């Protein structure tokens, strides 16, 4: 089933914090995107106001159910903004994570990365996630005992097919997140992100719009079907998943 998760806490070292409005979208078929914009960017953050962003298809993640509410997910991201931008001391390769369901309905994610090299010391991290109802306009907490919303939430995924770009848009219920990156650019000028919310009125509201080519990202998702093509300002996107 599709899922929309809001991050509540990020921790490296002894002091937890949360400086972002992070939402992660996971489609019914397992495609995913996580956008992590700063709430109050400052200084150098103003030019690229993101802690991080990553995305991938279900071919870039291995999911294993360990039982008792524990799942491991091993990621080889399609887009990793730190890698794309060649940020110093960035982990390269697979990221191994463990997800544990809490009785409250929150989900704890733990793992480790190797920013200084695979043969160097690891850096452990911890994140806490709250599933929210993607069929609602507001960020409504999902009760651990009532997930009927999941059967009604649409799950649509579009992937760019142009040789000059990589791109993915994931529609989960009313919430849309997407990225578009220029291949072989590797600067912030080559990155574009959107986060949209479909309101009760039927109109979509931009919660996040970043980049000079956001108009190449589709922003209408009606009358689609799997395998069809959507053209947005000259860029072709393929519908790789459609559950509505």
Curated annotation (Swiss-Prot):
It holds the Pfam family HRI1. It comes from the Eukaryota. Keywords: Cytoplasm, Nucleus, Phosphoprotein. The modification Phosphoserine is found at residue 143. GO terms for cellular component: cytoplasm; nucleus. It is found in: Cytoplasm; Nucleus. The keyword Phosphoprotein applies. Interacts with HRR25. May interact with SEC72. Belongs to the HRI1 family. This is Protein HRI1.
